[in-house]
Design a protein with these regions (language model features):
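Acetyl-CoA-dependent GNAT
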Residues: 37-82, 86-92, 109, 113, ...
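Conserved GNAT acetyl-CoA-binding A-motif
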Residues: 110-132
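Glycine-rich phosphate/pyrophosphate-binding loop shared by adenosine-nucleotide-utilizing enzymes
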Residues: 2-4, 63-67, 162
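Conserved GNAT-fold acetyl-CoA-binding loop/helix
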Residues: 18, 22-45
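Active-site acidic-Proline motif in GNAT/NAT acetyltransferases
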Residues: 87-92, 96, 124-126
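Conserved acetyl-CoA-binding loop-helix of GNAT-fold acetyltransferases
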Residues: 95-111, 134-138
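A short beta-loop-alpha structural element at the N-terminal edge
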Residues: 5-17
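Conserved catalytic-core motifs of GNAT/GCN5-like acyltransferases
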Residues: 121-123, 137, 141-160, 172-173, ...
């Protein structure tokens, strides 16, 4: 897709981002969330993410067509060089390279933050169904992620038990002389 602009999300984007996210909650097991958050709750999520991590949107013209962000992996200081990724693309804009562009930008920022390991927590169907396919796993594999763990039947949605896999991508070297994690706001000052 041409003319895609990637920029930092703002809490003011919450309503547009929620329009992208809501169908994932309502129709899929891609997220194990049951209830669509309010706009206020979504604004808070964006604000909380931006305190330490990037939250990016992809725009075509003035329409947001996707977003991706990273967040804390486990939430302890020893894990600062690891981050969890999330990505959501507008239903009508999938398979157009937007996700790949968003993740490329996320990886570039993560490297600048001295993040070395990226992780994705992905719903995994024993058998594909109308709510969950292998598309997310395949997308992440295409970008170099490897499956490193599988939790069986750990999430239940739409009266179905789903597995969850952790996928990992190393984007840096595990040197002894590791640099400190740099919070996202310090990169954009």
């Amino acid at each position: 897709m041409e003319n895609v602009n990637i920029r930092v999300a703002s809490p003011d984007d919450a309503e547009q981002l929620l329009k992208i996210y809501a169908p994932y909650v309502e129709k899929t097991a891609i997220t194990f969330e049951y209830d669509v958050p309010t706009v206020h709750e979504f604004k808070k999520r964006i604000e909380n993410t931006l305190e330490r991590y990037p939250d990016l949107v992809a725009e075509v013209g003035d329409k947001i067509v996707g977003y991706a962000y990273t967040g804390s992996f486990v939430g302890r200081a020893a894990y600062d060089h690891s981050a969890e990724t999330s990505i959501y693309i507008d239903e009508g804009c999938r398979n157009k390279g937007i996700g790949k562009r968003l993740y490329a930008a996320i990886e570039e920022i993560s490297v600048a933050q001295n993040v070395i390991n990226l992780y994705a927590c992905i719903g995994y169907p024993e058998v594909e169904d109308e709510h969950l396919t292998m598309n997310s796993v395949n997308f992440h594999e295409h970008l170099g992620y490897k499956t490193v763990g599988r939790f069986e039947k750990c999430g239940r949605k739409f009266d179905t038990w789903y597995d969850m896999v952790w996928m990992e991508k190393m984007i840096g070297e595990h040197d002894e002389d590791v640099k400190m994690f740099v919070p996202f706001p310090e990169l954009i000052l």
